Amino acid sequence: MWKQILSKLPNKKSSKHEHRGREHGGHSSSSSHTSGASTSKSTDNGAAKSHAKNASPAGKSAASDSGFKDGNLKSSGNNNNNNNNGVFTPYEALPSFKDVPNTEKQNLFIKKLNLCRVVFDFTDPTKNIKEKDIKRQTLLELVDYVNSPNGKFSEVGIQEVVRMVSANIFRTLNPQPRENKVIDALDLEEEEPSMDLAWPHLQLVYELFLRFVASPETDTKLAKRYIDQSFVLRLLDLFDSEDPRERDCLKTILHRIYGKFMVHRPFIRKSINNIFYRFVFETEKHNGIAEFLEILGSIINGFALPLKDEHKVFLVRVLIPLHKPKCLQMYHQQLSYCITQFVEKDCKLADTVIRGLLKYWPVTNSSKEVMFLNELEEVLEATQPPEFQRCMVPLFRQIARCLNSLHFQVAERALFLWNNNHIENLIMQNRKVILPIIFPALERNAQKHWNQAVHSLTLNVRKIFHDLDPELFKECLAKFKEDESKAAETEAKREATWKRLEELGVRKAS
């Protein structure tokens, strides 16, 4: 009996060893055979074992068996498991889809996806030219395959698409160093964007993924297991890429994911909000704010009425504070569209928006002030009289300051508000409140503004008020002259007081 038990022990070890061998890339017998062949060609045991592992054929796990790690391993000459050209072996083109029967196309699709998980180093254009071309041609074939009707994608196919895309696009972004994180929009505009050297491959990977997400052959229920929240978060991180081509692709893909995967919609909105919070209140540095706002503009446009409280909170806590950063110019057009969409959907929000603009109104940045005036006109165009009346006093105090600005573009843009018929009607309906607020600014411009265009526009606005309500105009003019006279008297008294103090100081000194 003891002999029988003891006789079984070696077999268990052998079985365990064989099982372990399978875990590491094949049967133990084939592994030892390959290792022996490699050892005869190389004196380095480590390199031989690595070579044996990396020689496994393509298949569902071909990329992992070949030592390729998703998104982490670039093809360079620094690894033990490559040949003299600095390429992982083997890396050869697979047959074309048209050269295999329909029953084999799914398997070939997966093999080609695994082949494309290898990430090449594009910093040296002379390295791996042949292999880079093989990958490019394979990606082109995959794009055509995904775009053509070949039946529903299997779960394995979906998983491998996501793995291949992840291996290629998810990487550490290396932004160009800047001395200051907070730099003005002019400097940002003059700086040329940094283009990713790997774009010849990245572009095709993005194109493939876009068509895959949009394809009717992609089962959303299956795909959401792999295009999950973790994947979406990593996708959002890529929006900070300095390459505008990549951000444009990401914008389209994220919009498609938002439309197709309804389960992810709240998570996507919340994650974008968090990026905005960090941008506004911490870094003031992000390359993808305009693209995010463009996506949100489309989303806001589809909001059902009445608006949910969640969406109103988003307007107040996220969109309005986005007027604060110095680099507003880089995304103002998209932000203004989002803001206007809210007011057009619910005119009662006009008062909230206008007061928000006044809160963040620039004091020392004239070009930013012009942008605020442009946006203000769009908001006022969608504003109804009740909402206008609630905010007109603080609003026209600010407009009066703009009218008196020595920066002619600010004063000119403020005067252009009277060219809008809807805004002019709102002003004239409430002229008894508005004219006394802005009359001093109009009169000073008419008397002594240095810019001829501003002077002419001011006279036109004065004439509009005079023709519509001459009595009110006379009252305002009389009040202005009285205030100016009092101000002159106060100034004269102040000067006389200072003069007496100076004389007193001279007497004491002598």
Curated annotation (Swiss-Prot):
Q: Which stretches are tagged as biased composition: Low complexity?
A: 27-42
Predominantly, its location class is: nucleus
Q: Where is the composition biased (Basic residues)?
A: 10-19
When this gene is knocked out, what is seen? Delayed flowering.
Q: Where in the cell is it found?
A: Nucleus, Nucleolus; Cytoplasm
Annotated GO MF terms:
protein phosphatase regulator activity
Report the GO terms under cellular component: cytoplasm; nucleolus; protein phosphatase type 2A complex
- Keywords assigned by UniProt, alphabetized: Brassinosteroid signaling pathway, Cytoplasm, Nucleus, Plant defense
Among its keywords, does the record have Kinase? no
Q: Which InterPro entries would you find in this protein's record?
A: ARM-like, ARM-type_fold, PP2A_B56
- Check the record and name the Pfam families matching this protein: B56 (PF01603)
Presence of the UniProt keyword Nucleus in the record: yes
Induction, per UniProt: Induced by epibrassinolide.
Provide the residue span(s) of the region labelled Disordered: 1-87
The similarity annotation says: Belongs to the phosphatase 2A regulatory subunit B56 family.
Annotated function:
The B regulatory subunit may modulate substrate selectivity and catalytic activity, and may also direct the localization of the catalytic enzyme to a particular subcellular compartment. The holoenzyme composed of PP2AA1, PP2A4 and B'ETA acts as negative regulator of plant innate immunity by controlling BAK1 phosphorylation state and activation in surface-localized immune receptor complexes. Required for the formation of the PP2A holoenzyme that negatively regulates brassinosteroid signaling by dephosphorylating and inactivating BRI1 in the cytoplasm.
UniProt subunit comment: PP2A consists of a common heteromeric enzyme, composed of a catalytic subunit (subunits C), a constant regulatory subunit (subunit A), and a variety of regulatory subunits such as subunits B (the R2/B/PR55/B55, R3/B''/PR72/PR130/PR59 and R5/B'/B56 families). Interacts with BZR1. Interacts with BRI1.
Report what the protein is called.
Serine/threonine protein phosphatase 2A 59 kDa regulatory subunit B' eta isoform
Source species: Arabidopsis thaliana
